[in-house]
């Protein structure tokens, strides 16, 4: 099994504590509300929302996929770090066992956030991940962060 790692960074004008609350801690409620084309709903399969929790995320009509199962691997609320894995679903296909992510929100000098994302694709056998697949995933993630950022800018009292 090969593991391919990709890193990317985004920036946001929203400070880490507020962005973490919205993107990580309340994502199951917020994303279907502000981006139903991306996520239709989230169903708790196992756990209480902490480490080890498994959720089935029903993707929206704007997605080419129908669902993913998402496992929470780590939550560090003090340092704004979130680790999770996509462990099942048509989005990972038959060549990937799972995709693990580490998201770190770091304060930027301007008062916003630097979002550092590391993705680990755990492949079945000696499969290589195509660059366009990774690029598409990065673009979806950046787009979702922008939707959240715009929501927070338009709702200054939310998630304070």
UniProtKB/Swiss-Prot annotation:
InterPro entries: Bet_v_I/MLP, Bet_v_I_allergen, Plant_def-hormone_signal, START-like_dom_sf. It holds the Pfam family Bet_v_1. Gene3D superfamilies: 3.30.530.20. Phosphorylated in vivo. Phosphorylation prevents its activity as ribonuclease. The keyword Phosphoprotein applies. Its EC number is 3.1.27.-. Keywords: Allergen, Hydrolase, Nuclease, Pathogenesis-related protein, Phosphoprotein, Plant defense. Highly expressed in roots. Expressed a low levels in ripe red fruits. One of its GO terms (cellular component) is cytoplasm. It comes from the Eukaryota. The keyword NADP does not apply. One of its GO terms (molecular function) is protein phosphatase inhibitor activity. GO terms for biological process: abscisic acid-activated signaling pathway; defense response. Possesses ribonuclease activity in vitro. Belongs to the BetVI family. This is Major strawberry allergen Fra a 1.07. The lineage of its organism: Eukaryota, Viridiplantae, Streptophyta, Embryophyta, Tracheophyta. The gene is Fra a 1.07.
